[in-house]
């Protein structure tokens, strides 16, 4: 939308912005009713920083997993790469700064924490968050023309802990044949 101030009054601009805000609020409200449960394997072979995060937070691995899975998160923003959603807020006990040395490659599906947020890496990218687990499958569907992200602003997300065997079974089931 382009507004030319010489052709429109302040009152008209205010009315237009009010309408736009009302529409965006309705859209956000309808999205906020959507929720998704994401299975995550918190096995140390997939949660590359699980042990170090446990040590840094003075929580056992089980307490760390419980803290991460025990709440509903809200998608606060998206960005960095398509399908990358910033979820908040994490349990105060697992708030940590980003890693001192970012990784050049974070595997797709990695679930990570930093500061007061958690994320799922939609594809392999560099990253500086603490990796505590990995979801099987993909958080995005790559089509020829577009990327369909499963997470959008306002959605509610909950993580569910799964075993390494369940992770492998889901990966095998979803593998292209």
Describe each region flagged by the PLM.
Residues 2-177:
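Glycine-rich active-site loops that engage anionic ligands at enzyme catalytic sites
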């Amino acid at each position: 939308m382009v507004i030319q101030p010489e052709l429109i009054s302040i009152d008209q601009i205010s009315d237009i912005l009010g309408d736009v805000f009302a529409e965006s609020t309705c859209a956000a409200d309808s999205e906020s009713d959507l929720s998704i449960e994401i299975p995550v394997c918190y096995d140390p072979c997939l949660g590359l920083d699980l042990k170090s995060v446990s040590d840094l937070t003075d929580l056992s691995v089980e307490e760390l997993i419980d803290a991460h899975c025990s709440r509903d998160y809200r998608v606060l923003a998206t960005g960095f790469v398509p399908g990358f959603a910033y979820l908040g807020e994490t349990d105060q006990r697992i708030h940590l700064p980003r890693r001192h040395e970012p990784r050049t490659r974070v595997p797709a599906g990695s679930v990570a924490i930093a500061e007061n947020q958690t994320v799922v890496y939609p594809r392999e990218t560099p990253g500086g968050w603490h990796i505590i687990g990995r979801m099987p499958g993909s958080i995005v569907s790559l089509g020829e023309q577009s990327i369909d992200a499963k997470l959008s602003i306002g959605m509610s997300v909950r993580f569910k802990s799964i075993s390494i065997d369940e992770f492998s079974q889901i990966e095998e089931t979803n593998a292209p044949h």
